[in-house]
Amino acid sequence: MRAVVLSEPGPAENLIVQDWPLPPERDGWVRIRVEAFGLNRSELMTRLGLSGDAVTFPRVLGIECAGVVDAAPAGSGLRSGQQVVAMMGEMGRTYDGSYADYTSVPLTQVIPMSTELPWEVVGALPEMIQTANGSLTIGLDLQAGETLLIRGGTSSVGLAAAALAKQLGATVLATTRRPDRLGMLKQRGIDLPIIDTGEIADEVRKHF
């Protein structure tokens, strides 16, 4: 298979597309045919050599992916060709990640899904949704009826957080520095879009 392999930390030129062994079938692991993957800052840090001793080389980077099941353990409930996403859990760090035609990850990291969205869209979702959802549920324990202010509301994580917060029943305020984005925030269900001048406390207090 093809893979983007980082032989050692350094410049982007150290990332080389080359032939790489197909991950073998393993008990408790799922082999995924990768259709798309997002690019993450942590991968940049690894490429620059800033991930410490956790990463060994050569390594196929990539901490998230979207694709279809190629091989799964018996009794896993997953079937060949099923759409899935996977992320984190040392993926692309202590074992090869998603910068390849195929990757193999522990079953516990695989999330089945079904969508008609194009792969290039789905590939950007796992880490974005995980970051937003974890912030709202684990970090904030956001409850219905509460009010949430999102700085940087037009970013991918900001938009994801807003959508999830609305599903939880929260009132959502979101900021943007661009007046032409206010309409977009309103269309996304934001209760109060705010222009971020760097000093938004007074604007928020006008309404709450």
Question: What are the residue ranges of the model-derived segments?
Answer:
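Cytochrome P450 core scaffold surrounding the K-helix E-X-X-R motif
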Residues: R41-L48
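Short amphipathic alpha-helix with an adjacent loop that forms part of the alpha/beta core around
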Residues: I200-F208
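Mid-domain Rossmann-like dinucleotide-binding core that forms the NAD(H)/NADP(H) cofactor-binding site
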Residues: L125-E199
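NAD(P)H dinucleotide-binding glycine-rich loop of Rossmann-like/cofactor-binding domains
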Residues: A86-G152
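Glycine-rich beta-strand-centered segment in the early N-terminal region that forms part
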Residues: P21-G38, L50-M91
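Conserved hydrophobic/aromatic beta-strand scaffold that supports enzyme active sites
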Residues: V17-D19, A66-V68, Y102-S104, V110, ...
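Extreme N-terminal starter segment of soluble prokaryotic enzymes
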Residues: M1-R2
